[in-house]
């Protein structure tokens, strides 16, 4: 009995960074084995710094901008990316919160989402929350999380079988959305051949 109590205490000591790495490992196990394309592979990584902007120094007489060589970047908790040869395409960013999430978190992460997607319009951006016992997304996230493409709650540190299945399905659908957005934005100045665009809302 004492041994079991010690194990439970050890599980309870997991922090946000450790939990995010656990989820990243789960994703990589799936992506490496089940999600491959003929010329590309998919991977997940943590603490990746992505650009959100750069500084315009001045303009020439034709108003062509001269940019700073250094990009402004934000660290992101988890990134799922596609690797094509020597090129990397960020597909999905997932910010992480563990055991609690506040209004400030929703606003701050939402602002990051907007800035990153301004530079990478095909990027999907979401929030995952771990070890939330009631597993309900709180109202403050609906009120202040409008810039997220998705949000997902895990009841405990270790995903249940159903959570694992649902989360993987969510990530795969977001990768597909990113691919579709890339195709859509690639039709600029051409006939798109697209006759319908729908933005869906799903609640589980």
Question: What are the language-model segments listed below?
Answer:
Residues 15-23, 70-74, 101-105:
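Phosphate/oxyanion-binding active-site loops and adjacent basic polyanion-contact surfaces
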Residues 110-113, 142-144:
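Short, solvent-exposed amphipathic alpha-helical segments in soluble enzyme
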Residues 42-85:
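Active-site metal-binding core of divalent-cation-utilizing nuclease and nuclease-like domains
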Residues 99-110, 136:
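Active-site-adjacent loop/helix micro-motif of nuclease/hydrolase catalytic cores
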Residues 78-80, 90-98, 109:
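Conserved catalytic cores of phosphodiester-cleaving nucleases, focusing on short active-site segments
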Residues 1-54, 121-122, 127-204:
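C-terminal tail/extension regions appended to the core domain(s) of diverse proteins
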Residues 114-118:
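Substrate-engagement module of ASCE P-loop NTPases
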Residues 71-75, 89-91, 120:
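Short connector loops at helix/strand junctions that flank enzyme active sites
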């Amino acid at each position: 009995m004492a041994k079991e109590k010690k194990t439970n205490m050890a599980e309870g000591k997991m922090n946000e960074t450790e939990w995010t790495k656990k989820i990243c490992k789960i994703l990589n196990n799936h992506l490496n084995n089940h999600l491959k394309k003929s010329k590309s592979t998919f991977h997940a990584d943590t603490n990746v710094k992505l650009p959100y902007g750069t500084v315009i120094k001045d303009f020439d007489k034709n108003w062509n901008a001269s940019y700073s060589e250094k990009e402004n970047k934000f660290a992101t908790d988890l990134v799922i990316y596609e690797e094509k040869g020597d090129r990397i395409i960020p597909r999905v960013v997932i910010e992480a919160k563990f055991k609690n999430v506040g209004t400030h978190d929703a606003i701050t992460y939402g602002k990051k989402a907007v800035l990153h997607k301004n530079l990478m319009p095909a990027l999907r951006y979401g929030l995952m929350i771990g070890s939330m016992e009631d597993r309900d997304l709180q109202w403050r996230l609906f009120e202040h999380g409008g810039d997220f493409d998705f949000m997902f709650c895990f009841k405990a540190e270790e995903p249940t079988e159903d959570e694992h299945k649902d989360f993987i399905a969510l990530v795969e659908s977001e990768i597909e959305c990113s691919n579709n957005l890339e195709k859509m934005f690639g039709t600029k100045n051409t006939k798109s051949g697209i006759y319908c665009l729908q933005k869906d809302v799903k609640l589980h």
